[in-house]
Amino acid sequence: MGQKVSPVGLRIGVIRDWESKWYADKDFATLLHEDLKIRKYVKGRLKDAAVSTIEIERAANRVNVTIHTAKPGMVIGKGGSEVETLRKTLTDLTGKRVHININEIKRPDLDATLVAENIARQLENRISFRRAQKQSITRTLRSGAKGIKTLVSGRLGGADIARSEGYSEGTVPLHTLRADIDYGTAEAHTTYGRIGVKVWIYRGEVLPARKNVATEEGGK
């Protein structure tokens, strides 16, 4: 099961939380599409700002948007001009009061989405898909990851037949729910068509192992 489903979705409620935090009865579909519009617009406008996750919280007629980025300066802009323009646009888009929070990602090489987007940008710049993957794997492991797996799919190197090729270093225990595994995807738009990029990063365990818990209880 762990090999098939998204590692992020599988761990929601165990070691991860939802990216959209609100409840609705009748307006659920409307608000869901509103969330999708917000994420699509923010991702498109800030495509060069290394944006990873966009969290959305709702309360009455207010929307709180938290943007996780490796380049907060680019999102905020000179004197806060960029983030203010973004806030006004989202207010017009949703018809609600929008508040924007910026969270800096301290170690972008441990964020699967940012690593996947970095590989995709390299592929668009005609860098070898093998070299792009190996460089990203090396940087991620140097940043403290326990393991990483990458996969690129499409007309690799301009081949006539599409195929998939990936690399794996360290351990990536997809079945272990207490394992903090980040998963991210990206697309590279090349002259030969689209190339999909997938990245899994194992950052260590979040919950204590059962043996440790049993030992502590026995010691008491």
Swiss-Prot record:
Gene3D superfamilies reported for this sequence: 3.30.300.20, Ribosomal protein S3, C-terminal domain
CDD domains assigned: KH-II_30S_S3 (cd02412)
GO function term, MF aspect, one: mRNA binding
Keywords assigned: Ribonucleoprotein, Ribosomal protein, RNA-binding, rRNA-binding
Domain KH type-2: 38-106
Domain of life of the native organism: Bacteria
InterPro entries for the chain: KH_dom, KH_dom-like_a/b, KH_dom_type_2, KH_sf_prok-type, Ribosomal_S3_C_sf, Ribosomal_uS3_bac-typ, Ribosomal_uS3_C, Ribosomal_uS3_CS
SUPFAM superfamilies linked to this entry: Prokaryotic type KH domain (KH-domain type II), Ribosomal protein S3 C-terminal domain
GO biological process, one term: translation
GO cellular component, one term: cytosolic small ribosomal subunit
One Pfam entry name: KH_2
NCBIfam families documented for this protein: rpsC_bact
Quaternary structure note: Part of the 30S ribosomal subunit. Forms a tight complex with proteins S10 and S14.
Protein family according to the UniProt entry: Belongs to the universal ribosomal protein uS3 family.
Job of this protein: Binds the lower part of the 30S subunit head. Binds mRNA in the 70S ribosome, positioning it for translation.
Name assigned to this protein: Small ribosomal subunit protein uS3
Protein's organism: Brevibacillus brevis (strain 47 / JCM 6285 / NBRC 100599)
